[in-house]
């Protein structure tokens, strides 16, 4: 066990510091904004320092582990720890949350509560990624939902209450299945119940029971990821939420579902995952085509970007279902890659809305001349989203392709069919993304409007855009930076399978 409680401090610090903000004197919104940004930067620096000096990349076991008895009545411990699977998502959470707080500068209504909720969400997300106890994982999972619901219902578009209600119904409903899975898997088998993930990873179950556990967890994570047909909350939520909230949703919250699939479904229930993986492969392939086909029909800019997130999630599902070293590595890389790309696209969509106050693409046009910086960044990041070589998305999708090709689980004809359908999806992706850019930035619609004028990106927005773009290009050029973190853990997970 680690001598110093690094992870406890990293998890508790944001929400504790955010609580202090409620007692700060009322001296305008700027105090709250800069206080929150300072907390996020300090948290990110603390996390980076703790990981740099205490994390060994060649060790697949849990590191920085903490294990404290919490409730004596039953076997409930405050168990924290990280490995190659969680370190990338925790660093991504810190980076995106810091930039999202900077993006939230235009928010003036109830600024104190808004920034407190962002910090509370920060704690819940890091807690989920670093939990080594199933019940603690569930608590952190639920803790993170409350701030998201309030952020959706209080700040956003005209239909924000509808989208927030839809979000909470979907996620709270899926949490019932998560709780059933947690209680079932912890109470089965041994003489006394255990919630320790490390012990549960070595537990074996009757086939029928393992399938039931797998389905319960799969439903919970499929809603959050999202996986079709449980995705319908996502376009509505993204369409109405404030763009800083969208950055957190696309950049981090969706990744929690994918993380759960690997951490629990794949690691704890390998036999059931092996049985379900062909079906997940089919769903992932359909998802890529479905989202890429549906996206061009969306008038709302943020809804169109939301469907691109659904399409990218298809590659993650396929990578997880391939049960191969390249496939799983590609899925993990895609989780990190899309965290940056999704957050960046929603930020640029939000900054565009701040200027023109239009959400429908068919009402836009001709913006490129007046806002060349936003136009340039939007074009570059659209290229990143459609997996242009040299960008992180290209490497991630390419490795997933290798994962399918090298998989021993599927017949050759199945692999050819899957790759063919995925290729069609990759052809459709540039169509809806480039069409989106054309509708926004080309033509003469806004230029012909009387008194048409608005300003381009300021220093804050330019800094934010470049800050997200740099890791996208960096990972695209040198993907080993991310892959080296998880490679040993991936091998450890796949050692439970008979092929790959």
Curated annotation (Swiss-Prot):
Keywords on record: Chloroplast, Membrane, NAD, NADP, Plastid, Plastoquinone, Quinone, Thylakoid, Translocase, Transmembrane, Transmembrane helix
Pfam families: Proton_antipo_M (PF00361)
Subcellular location: Plastid, Chloroplast thylakoid membrane
A single GO BP: electron transport coupled proton transport
Residue intervals passing through the bilayer: 4-24, 35-55, 87-107, 113-130, 134-154, 167-187, 211-231, 242-262, 272-292, 305-325, 330-350, 386-406, 416-436, 462-482
Enzyme Commission no: 7.1.1.-
GO molecular function: NADH dehydrogenase (ubiquinone) activity; ubiquinone binding
Signal peptide: none
Catalytic activity entry: a plastoquinone + NADH + (n+1) H(+)(in) = a plastoquinol + NAD(+) + n H(+)(out); a plastoquinone + NADPH + (n+1) H(+)(in) = a plastoquinol + NADP(+) + n H(+)(out)
GO CC aspect terms: chloroplast thylakoid membrane
Domain of life assignment: Eukaryota
Membrane topology reported for the UniProt record: Multi-pass membrane protein
Annotated InterPro entries: NADH_Q_OxRdtase_chain4, NADH_Q_OxRdtase_chainM/4, NADH_UbQ_OxRdtase, ND/Mrp_TM
HAMAP family xrefs: NDH1_NuoM
Family assignment from sequence similarity: Belongs to the complex I subunit 4 family.
Name by which UniProt lists this protein: NAD(P)H-quinone oxidoreductase chain 4, chloroplastic
Protein source organism: Olimarabidopsis pumila (Dwarf rocket)
Gene: ndhD
């Amino acid at each position: 066990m680690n001598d110093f409680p690094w992870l406890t401090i990293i998890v508790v610090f944001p929400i504790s510091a955010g609580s202090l903000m409620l007692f700060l004197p009322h001296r305008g919104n700027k105090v709250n904004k800069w206080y929150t940004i300072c907390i996020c930067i300090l948290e990110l620096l603390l996390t980076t320092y703790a990981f740099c000096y205490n994390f060994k990349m060649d060790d697949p076991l849990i590191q920085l582990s903490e294990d404290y008895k919490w409730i004596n009545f039953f076997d409930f411990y405050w168990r924290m720890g990280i490995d190659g699977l969680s370190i990338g998502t925790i660093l991504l959470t810190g980076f995106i949350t810091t930039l999202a707080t900077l993006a939230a500068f235009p928010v003036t209504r109830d600024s104190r509560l808004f920034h407190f909720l962002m910090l509370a969400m920060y704690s819940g997300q890091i807690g989920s990624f670093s939990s080594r106890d199933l019940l603690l994982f569930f608590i952190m999972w639920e803790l993170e939902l409350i701030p998201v619901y309030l952020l959706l219902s209080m700040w956003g578009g005209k239909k924000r209450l509808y989208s927030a209600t839809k979000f909470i119904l979907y996620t709270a409903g899926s949490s019932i299945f998560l709780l059933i899975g947690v209680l079932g898997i912890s109470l089965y088998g041994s003489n006394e119940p255990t919630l320790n993930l490390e012990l549960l990873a070595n537990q074996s179950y009757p086939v029928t029971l393992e399938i039931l556990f797998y389905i319960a967890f799969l439903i919970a994570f499929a809603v959050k990821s999202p996986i079709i047909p449980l995705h319908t909350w996502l376009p509505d939520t993204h369409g109405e939420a404030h763009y800083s909230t969208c950055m957190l949703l696309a950049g981090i919250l969706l990744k929690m579902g994918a993380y759960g699939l690997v951490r629990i479904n794949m690691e704890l229930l390998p036999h059931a995952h092996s049985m379900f993986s062909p079906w997940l492969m089919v769903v992932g392939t359909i998802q890529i085509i479905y989202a890429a086909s549906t996206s061009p029909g969306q008038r709302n800019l943020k809804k169109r970007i939301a469907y691109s997130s659904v399409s990218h999630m298809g590659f993650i599902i396929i990578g997880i279902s391939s049960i191969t070293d390249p496939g799983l590595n590609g899925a993990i890389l895609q989780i990190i890659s899309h965290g940056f790309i999704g957050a960046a696209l929603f930020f640029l969509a939000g900054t565009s809305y701040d200027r023109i106050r239009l959400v429908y693409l068919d009402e836009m046009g001709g913006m490129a001349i007046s806002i060349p910086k936003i136009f340039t960044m939007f074009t570059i990041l659209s290229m990143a989203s459609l997996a242009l070589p040299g960008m992180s998305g290209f490497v991630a999708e390419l490795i997933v392709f290798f994962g399918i090709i090298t998989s021993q689980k599927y017949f050759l004809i199945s692999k050819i069919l899957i790759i063919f359908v995925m290729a069609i999806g990759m052809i459709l992706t540039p169509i809806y993304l480039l069409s989106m850019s054309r509708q926004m930035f080309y033509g003469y619609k806004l230029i012909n409007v009387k008194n048409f004028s608005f300003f381009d990106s300021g220093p804050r927005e330019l800094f934010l855009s470049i800050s997200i773009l740099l890791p996208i290009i960096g990972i695209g050029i040198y993907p080993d930076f991310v892959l080296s973190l998880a490679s040993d853990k991936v091998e450890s997970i796949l050692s439970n399978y008979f092929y790959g």
